[in-house]
Amino acid sequence: MTTSSNQQVVLAARPDGDLKPTDLRLEDVAVPTPEDGEVLLETIYLSIDPYMRWWMRAEKSYNDPIEINQVIVGATVSRVRQSRHGDWQVGDWVLAFSGWKHFAISNGSDLRRLDPDVAPPSTALGVLGMTGFTAYAGLRNIGKPKPGETVVVAAASGAVGSMVGQIARLRGARAVGITTGAQKLSYLTDELHFDAVADYNAPDFAEQLAKACPDGIDVYFENVGGKIWDAVLPLLNTYARIPVCGVISQYEKPSGAQENIDRLSNTMTQIMGKSLTLRGFIQTEYAEEQLADFLQEAGQWIADGKLRYREHMTQGLHTAPQALIDLLKGRHFGKTIVQVGEP
């Protein structure tokens, strides 16, 4: 490897409201050199995920916030370009957490080996990665759908939502997807075989959702929040389960903003009155015990043509800021990925 150019994207300013391209900065830095026990990784594919915007806030959540001038965090599919580590060879494909940079150093402890003959490497960021496992773990551990029950998911044409609906159907449940726009609605019913859909931007959204769920909602996979939650709440059945993996509608609210302050008290009343189970989760809490099960089961579903996925891929690290902005605005289907290097 002879290149001496290494690009990275850092947080230039803390966003207040909608993320702007000027909140991020593309920099040129030197390619690092591995020491004994280390490898040099080249990022081939970079995962773009909603949580990245949440970590740009000043407030700590389940992780420390990204600091000003710090490289944006993110999962990557990378290749070993130089190795001074006995377990890793030049050319190996790995899943890493290198962040928004072209080249990175690793001591190998945070790497997972990938086999490109088993599945396209980019799938380790989506359908066979964090997003797919988020859907799997949330349903397996919290949602626990039973045959014949109704499972509703918002942002249903996105990376997580599209997996939630398909896995629910594979478990014998009805899948109802919430999204907006004719193309996304038809994608859910025609390609992913959701049982019903509702358009959250339609004036009669609440009526559409009620019609799609004539027997109520048994599982609501929450990843959006806001007005969608307001429409879902009255339809929840007694003992319904609500896995919460995100509230993307709130990620770009200005710091300290409060909206519909009485929403929490109404939610708490419903939780008590209907004996609801509502639990937030981060997929990593289940990974050690269940990731292998997921990879085996999901891999078989894909091989059998039972689990479908889409990837929206842009080219070049410089496209990552706009890719995240577009993701937060719901402009694309499926999993958003940036191709940074050449395989």
Give names to the regions the model predicted.
Residues 2-4, 285-343:
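C-terminal hydrophobic helical "lid"/dimerization subdomain
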